[in-house]
Amino acid sequence: MPIVPEILREVALTEEEYARAVALLGREPNLIELGMIGALWSEHCGYKHSRPLLRKLPTSGPHVVQGPGENAGAVELGDGLVVVLKIESHNHPSAVEPFQGAATGVGGIVRDIFAMGARPIALADSLRFGPLEEPRQQYLFHGVVGGIGWYGNCLGIPTVAGDVFFAPEYRQNPLVNAMCVGIAERSALIRARATGPGNLVVLVGADTGRDGIHGATFASVEDPERSHRGVVQVGNPFLEKLLLEACLEVLETGAVVAMQDLGAAGLTSASAEIAARGGTGIELDVALVPRRETGMTPYEVMLSESQERMLLVVDPEGIDRVLAIFRRWELHAVVIGRVTDDGLLRVLEDGQVVAELPVWLLTDACPTYVREAREAGEIRERRAFDPDALPDLQPAEVAEMLAALLRSPNIASRRPIYRTYDHTILTNTVLPPGAADAAVLRIKGQRFGIALKTDCNPRYCLLDPRLGTMHAVAEAARNVSCVGAEPLAITDCLNFGNPERPEIYYQLVQAIEGMAEACTVLGIPVVSGNVSLYNETEGRSIPPTPVVGIVGRLADVRRCVGMGFRGEGKVFLLGSELATLGGSEFLAQRHGLVAGAPPPLDLELERRVQACVREGIARGIVLAAHDCSEGGLLIALAESCMVGRIGGRFTTESLIAANGRLDRALFGESASRVIVQVAEGAEGALLGLARAHGVPVQELGRTGGDRFVVGELVDQPLSELIELWTTGLVESA
């Protein structure tokens, strides 16, 4: 049939890309082949705009076992164990059907982890919504949170960390980024590489339906006109639990050569990717694929994104053992093809060839684009705004401002979110959500443990995408350092608008360059990740949102500390005393502005502050640690008091004098700042430690009592602050 523009739009190929495919193939592709090319050449699968840029990121390091290019990254922990980590987006499906979109996002990221041979032990999520007082945003919020909790809870995997942010720019395009970590024996890791011609290709899991067809291309274009409910998959966490356990068991047979999740572009992507990595070809017969719907065409079978499916390459000598294990788990597993040595992805239907493409054409020949990059003038104007031109906060207004910030959705307690998640199942959670700047998990049978967190301040990234992304890396690392963990590796999820627009491509370029610089200076490799572009509707884009997921290692999990103050003791500030109002939560709440330059970031000072905090925790000097981020110093102090359920008396005169303004000193934001509570009698040790690391330090006050007192500015019962903080999100939703 002739290829007309309507068909090209359906598969998200431009006329130029179609001409490229014809030239490379030496003939016109048929409709099935065209759909396969469109899916694998989509932004979602082919990374057309980001692939050249991602090469700038540091991906190697002394602990890295597996970097980008596999289902997930892996980092050495010690004693023969590795931690496997990955983050991915499910933004577009969640905007259409929030519950199932978020739920299947969790399912997909979990499959990426056990596809490596690792047992998933924890989840984290990074979420973005519009203003929560709006009914549609409440619908999205409750749907997404409910979907994450439902799928994770049913799977028996705790959701222990994450972050959430609310801003008008996310009204039409919410973001749902899901992260999973797993633990494996290094020797048991398996790669998704289809080696060994003659080995068998096995499809296991759910029967294939029509759900999710064109899901990859849907996530690669801006198309607000169409209803896309049909491309949102429906998840079955109970089936995934069986799949997880069965896949880990069949790996023990030694007969499994490769394993791959069926995610975006379904069977097409999974088979092409494992063949490409293995330097082989694959022949499949779609007539052998179990289906739950009648009349499905080869096109639909190859592009279906039905959930809870895995593709395995199995040695023929072990196939009976593998299939027997799957039967015992009551899973439908069938041999649908074999590995070949001709480098082709050949699709049969009842033995007749219906599509045949070179694997390299699908995976390596996807065009890449370098676009014009130009910063939007409106953003330059916003960044040039000087917050000092605004009237300063008056002393009598400080307590009221503190209350307003504590109940604002971007600062209020996240308990209404994480209470819907089972965060203690598996009995590994040492520091749960809300107790610390990062979650801490033990590894059974080991003294060491891991910490994990996600971070990104989109206001900073909007105003300065390079600096804002550097802040995201620094804050994520600071968060795991504040529990005593050494940052090991990062997995990133780059959420942006339409890269064909110069101002959006500029944001993407700047963000990746900023991430590369921060990771290089801090010595943290990027081992996996995901790119989600075209997050915009009718030309209105989301702010650049490069989410950083991080994993850290604690040498002794028993020595971790939380953010809550523990009993009476002195409190100190480590890091710079200077702050800024640019891009701050205060500026948005008080003046309704997202403007000014984000705080400067000295990466060398950041590195020293984090090392100082980690050593202080390891030596037992530091009893509690909390980084100063959104809301500034006063919010950080209040949060540590509220979490620890103890009051305190603090003084800020020197900070006010140094900053020259009351609002900047109390609610201004800055990088490289951590408040710490010190063990009785250990004040001198902290001062000596700070000097040794070259870190500024000053005393802020002392904990005790049941009131929160800041000089002559604030004197309130802690219980009142707790009430404001813990109900803020509930009242908004």
UniProtKB/Swiss-Prot annotation:
Molecular function in Gene Ontology: ATP binding; magnesium ion binding; phosphoribosylformylglycinamidine synthase activity
Catalytic activity: N(2)-formyl-N(1)-(5-phospho-beta-D-ribosyl)glycinamide + L-glutamine + ATP + H2O = 2-formamido-N(1)-(5-O-phospho-beta-D-ribosyl)acetamidine + L-glutamate + ADP + phosphate + H(+)
Active site per UniProt: 44, 90 (proton acceptor)
InterPro entries in the record: PRibForGlyAmidine_synth_PurL, PurL_linker, PurM-like_C_dom, PurM-like_C_sf, PurM-like_N, PurM-like_N_sf
EC number: 6.3.5.3
Top EC class, one word: ligase
Role played: Part of the phosphoribosylformylglycinamidine synthase complex involved in the purines biosynthetic pathway. Catalyzes the ATP-dependent conversion of formylglycinamide ribonucleotide (FGAR) and glutamine to yield formylglycinamidine ribonucleotide (FGAM) and glutamate. The FGAM synthase complex is composed of three subunits. PurQ produces an ammonia molecule by converting glutamine to glutamate. PurL transfers the ammonia molecule to FGAR to form FGAM in an ATP-dependent manner.
PANTHER family: PHOSPHORIBOSYLFORMYLGLYCINAMIDINE SYNTHASE SUBUNIT PURL
Protein name: Phosphoribosylformylglycinamidine synthase subunit PurL
Species, as recorded: Thermomicrobium roseum (strain ATCC 27502 / DSM 5159 / P-2)
Gene for this chain: purL
